Amino acid sequence: MKTTHRIYFKNSADMNELKDKSINLVVTSPPYPMVEIWDRLFSELNPKIEETLIDEEDGLRSYNLMHEELEKVWHEVDRVTAPGGVVIINIGDATRKIGKKFQLYPNHVRTIDFFFDRGYQVLPFIIWRKQSNKPTKFMGSGMLPPNAYVTHEHEYILIFRKEGPRQFKTEEERKLRRESAYFWEERNQWFSDVWTDLTGVSQRLNHKNLRKRAAAYPFELAYRLINMYSIMGDWVLDPFLGTGTTMIAAACAGRNSIGYELDHNFKDLIESRINETLKLSNEIVMRRINDHIEFIREKNGKYYSENYKFKVTTRQEQDIRLYYPRTYKKIKNNEFEFFYQEVNPKKERQSKLNI
């Protein structure tokens, strides 16, 4: 098996390199409107935004202008997403004081409205709870009613589907779908509507411009979503690639990927992370298998994996195949190919299979 991964360092409001309806899954986290670290970026895209932040008493105009910039990208996302494809957007609301007025800016609502208005099915979303232990996390009047504010400690993982459920028309597509299944216990964990077991990523970046601009979700978040909403060999798009997390997760999961990133300063960091993918992927796949084996020891599943001969809980798990990249090469500037082999748990962890 082979996958291809391409990076374009340009504004994703124009993804003319991509054909219409060519992407199976979008996983991304855009800059959040009305969060101060992104003010400069949005102002570079539209100078009117900086003017409104300085001159106006409330932030509604700034909020709308920032979302208009994001919606240029969402229009392109809509164009390139295939029927049955899924668009997943991790976004947080913002709380901010403009002039004397403090309020919440509901970024997730504006994003839902965009895709709803274009006929997408709005699927149940996930609350990603990111608890803060900062001593200054309480806002407003402290212990005195009534002017304190609820602490904001979660983000949204919004999920949209284009034109109804995806159809798998050929036997090869149906076979790949079966081989891309996840374990029963993973399904129970991953498809919860509240995720509390993932923490945000603390960026330790040397470049001063990157420190200001980086905001990454953890690898596990992207890896889960890619396994939940795509099959091996699919094309995954991240129009706000940042440090490359979505691309790394796609490579580990045996999917192709395309990323767009406005800031060329991320190039070296992304390539260094790509270099670490081989080791990471092997660890991730073996962890999934070992966790499953520990689970099934107590569960005593009714069925057997056709490929690995360990027990599984349901028939839908019987054809699971897990691969990891054994090597990769850079085939041209900003384009990489990964080459895979199937995991052999019996060979690598024989002692774990005596169940």
Swiss-Prot record:
UniProt record, GO biological process: DNA restriction-modification system; methylation
InterPro entries in the record: DNA_methylase_N4/N6, MeTrfase_CN4_CS, RM_Methyltransferase, SAM-dependent_MTases_sf
Catalytic activity, reaction form: a 2'-deoxycytidine in DNA + S-adenosyl-L-methionine = an N(4)-methyl-2'-deoxycytidine in DNA + S-adenosyl-L-homocysteine + H(+)
E.C. number: 2.1.1.113
Keywords: DNA-binding, Methyltransferase, Plasmid, Restriction system, S-adenosyl-L-methionine, Transferase
GO cellular component term of the entry, any: cytoplasm
UniProt GO MF annotations: DNA binding; N-methyltransferase activity; site-specific DNA-methyltransferase (adenine-specific) activity; site-specific DNA-methyltransferase (cytosine-N4-specific) activity
Coiled coil: none
Family as reported in the entry's similarity comment: Belongs to the N(4)/N(6)-methyltransferase family. N(4) subfamily.
Name this protein carries in UniProt: Type II methyltransferase M.MthZI
GN (gene name): mthZIM
